[in-house]
Regions:
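Conserved glycosyltransferase catalytic-site signature
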Residues: 6, 69, 91-94
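A generic structural signal for short hydrophobic patches within well-formed alpha-helices
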Residues: 9-10, 19, 37-40, 72, ...
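Acidic catalytic patch
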Residues: 63-83
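Acidic, metal-associated active-site segment
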Residues: 40, 90-106
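Short, well-structured N-terminal submotif of metal-dependent ribonuclease cores
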Residues: 1-32, 44-57
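Histidine- and aromatic-rich ligand-binding microenvironments
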Residues: 4-5, 32-33, 89-90, 111, ...
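Acidic, PIN/NYN-like endoribonuclease modules and their adjacent C-terminal/linker elements
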Residues: 101-132
């Protein structure tokens, strides 16, 4: 299984060649967080009449995992450790990372939002945009 951040889903939808190749080489099933589903949809809204269901169907092959209390507690523990190290992450990114961690799968991202030493010790994170 492969866990995709919204940045990767967006790049896949846009056909970014290196991202598409990397993800397809990993194989299905593709998983994501329900937070990522919202982030992708949020990037498409604004007309007042956006077909949200159609937007979601564009990446319908990616199964969303719901947030639950265990994931929220895991994210809280991660934030506690980060803050002890003098760092802090956005709540949404921690919820995504905690969801990925709950699966034990590689978290594939295409931005620098997940680059902390602690996080990379807890979750197998691959950043396809290492220079971001």
């Amino acid at each position: 299984m492969t866990f995709l951040d919204s940045s990767v889903i967006i790049d896949m939808l846009e056909g970014v060649p290196d991202v598409v190749e990397y993800v397809e080489d990993r194989g299905q099933p593709y998983l994501t967080s329900s937070v990522c589903v919202f982030e992708v949809i949020d990037g498409e809204v604004g007309s007042g009449s956006t077909d949200i269901v159609a937007v979601r169907q564009e990446f319908g092959g990616v199964r969303a995992l719901d947030l639950n209390e265990q994931i929220a507690l895991g994210a809280g523990r991660m934030q506690d450790q980060l803050m002890d190290d003098g760092e802090r992450m956005a709540a949404r990114d921690l919820l995504i990372a905690a969801t990925a961690r709950s699966t034990g799968d590689e978290l594939i991202v295409a931005d620098g939002d997940f680059e902390t030493q602690l996080l990379t010790n807890l979750v197998d994170v691959t950043n396809l945009r290492g220079d971001d």
